Amino acid sequence: MVTPPPSTYRLQIRKSFTLDDAAAVVGYLRELGVGAVYLSPILQSTTGSDHGYDTTDPLRIDTDRGGESGWSALLAAATDAGLQVVVDIVPNHLGISAARENPYWWDVLTHGRESPYAAWFDIDWSRPITVPVLGDDAVLSVADGELAYYEHRFPLAPGSWAAGDDPDAVHERQHYRLVHHSRGDAELSYRRFFTVTTLAGVRQEDPAVFEATHRRVASMIAEGVAGLRVDHPDGLVDPGEYQERLARLAPDAWITVEKILEPGERLPDWPVAGTTGYDAMREVNGVFVDLAGEAAATERYRRLTGDGLTSTEHVEQGKRMILDRLLVAEVRRIAGLAPDVADADAAIAEVAIAFGVYRSYLPDGVADLDKALVLAEQRRPELAAALATLSPRLHDPADELARRFQQLSGATMAKGTEDTAFYRYARFIALNEVGADAGEFGIGLDDFHALQQVRQQGQPLSMTSLSTHDTERGEDVRARLAVLAELGEEWERFAAAVVARAEGSNAAFAYFLAQTLVGVGAVEDRDRLHAYAEKAMREASQETRWTAVDEEYERGVQALIDLAYDDAALRDGWERLLALVEEPGWSNALGQKLVQLTMPGVPDVYQGTELWEDSLVDPDNRRPVDFAERRRLLASLTGTPRVDGSGAAKLWVTTTALRLRRDRPELFGSYAPVPVTGSGAQHAIAYDRGGALTVATRLPVGLARAGGWGDTVLGLEGGWTDVLSGHAYDGPVRLADLLASLPVALLVR
């Protein structure tokens, strides 16, 4: 492996921020202290795509994102600045929403199984390819040698039509069938990404397909790309085999995988540096949450909302809904592999619901499969016979049924948990994050240290993250929300007022919105909150959903947001609570930032998060970043800034930690907790990475109520200098002195 970058900085490349634009900010990133430019997908994607995860041609750089010239400019700028380049790749699927834009899919639609690209896609060839694009007025036409439906165009098989032929008759002669868009979830004939019918699964298990789809990736490596981020490996038939092929293609690259690990789960033994950091995010988030607040938070939530379900029960319901409504075609395809098993579809679905992690990697993960089988039978004893018959096949790595089930369970977990249950279960939404368990109310200090020692020993080169393009809410939103675990009466007063105003609305969702208002704050652009609320309530899929919108209910929810702005009493309560949350929220934000930047692993800074940020789920977290303002503020920093609304303190902490990791990597080779004694000991996170010692304040409200640090002492040995404040210390130091100007410290010998 090449020397991994000391840190990365994620840039979202798109038409409005191209590779040329990225090249223009490389100098700023160098000054910030970043070690590598980390790019979102840059291969040719669907026209207008803002994210790039819908690649249409994996063999060329996206024209709208800067094309080959922009790519060359970015590489040159990074090389001149001494920065490495890391690229996000998407092997699991290709975008097919505009069939003509994907030449490989177009050819398959044209020639069917005889297409040279037929092996690229995971298609059920027992029937025509299902294309769910039609509305209620399925009026087709033939124009310019293509089948047309409004703006959609589809190819015609050679010899399948003649001038004057009836379009419906021509349609019947094709290798595909256009059907109503509502039929896709139940009738789709190809594997897709989660529930997105416009993202067709790619058969990377075929060596020829891997080689063909990775030619541009291989040339990127030859051009100097140092690292790869692999999107959604769990969608592949055999992620481990894929990673082995990728490691042979790029033997010196730093490779991380977007593998979502459940609490306690370990990454399989793949030839990768580690994950993309959601596991680290869960640990950092958790240690800033007051475990002692759980009982009160649970009681308050149940009393105000009437929601008596646990997180586990919400996840079960979410998964069941996803399988009943959306992943029907996937379940049917698997059940079709066991035609002699009565209730095979119900049994397959029940095991997927019961699966406690995203998926197994047979023969690894048998214990998780066995647990799921037992739980499935307990929940549905009438399926015992079907489960017993299917069990040997589900355990067989060579059985297509087992392979497809493993792909199904990951989609079920993601859609049922992150995209459904996390929008329904609103006890404490700071915990409702990718890779986290909403039922796990924080992480204790000793457990946090133990987890970092495991990380240092097992995956010291794994990525760590606080915010990504996929997080449910940004890092500082979660930092502010964490304060609510320490505020009882004050938080309840506002939450109760919001719920009371939610006439005709789901009380739990109103409670969810009340927390969102605290996490984001009184932003000037309330339309952001309206857009977020629309997405959140439709993802929850209770009173309203994407495919069955209840306009009256949605108007009521949006009116509740307007009340927070326009009703004097509610606005006053909101602002009073925000005033209480502000300073401890800043403390949490600085603490978690420094911890993430200095803990074992390679830290990533998501674009713009070196200043305070208030982002919510995508697309809100892909808003433009004002790099000119960040460059100006960075240049103005000459010493320790005040902690205030400017965000200068966060920028100072970020750049100081990044520069130290870049310039003195030898200080970050181990992990050991540093003893803290005194009345405030549980409010300090302190660890030594081998010469770089981090101290961060946790649970700041409780600390203030106890009178501050008092007699609390950090057990230093010898001489140290805090690179954040410039102050030097020799031997044990009072935290009241060490943390007098900032709630964090970064000491070096």
For each of these PLM feature ranges, what is it?
Residues 1-47, 55, 59-64, 72, ...:
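Carbohydrate-interacting/catalytic domains
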Residues 74-121:
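Hydrophobic or amphipathic alpha-helical targeting/insertion segments
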Residues 356:
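An anion/pyrophosphate-binding glycine-rich loop and adjacent beta-alpha core
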Residues 47-51, 97-98:
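Short glycine-biased active-site loop of nucleotidyltransferases that positions the nucleotide triphosphate
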Residues 93, 236-237:
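Catalytic P-loop NTPase motifs of RecA-like helicase/translocase cores
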Residues 122-183:
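DnaQ-like (DEDDh/DEDDy) 3′-5′ exonuclease domain used for proofreading
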Residues 12, 227-232:
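Short catalytic-loop micro-motif centered on adjacent basic/acidic residues
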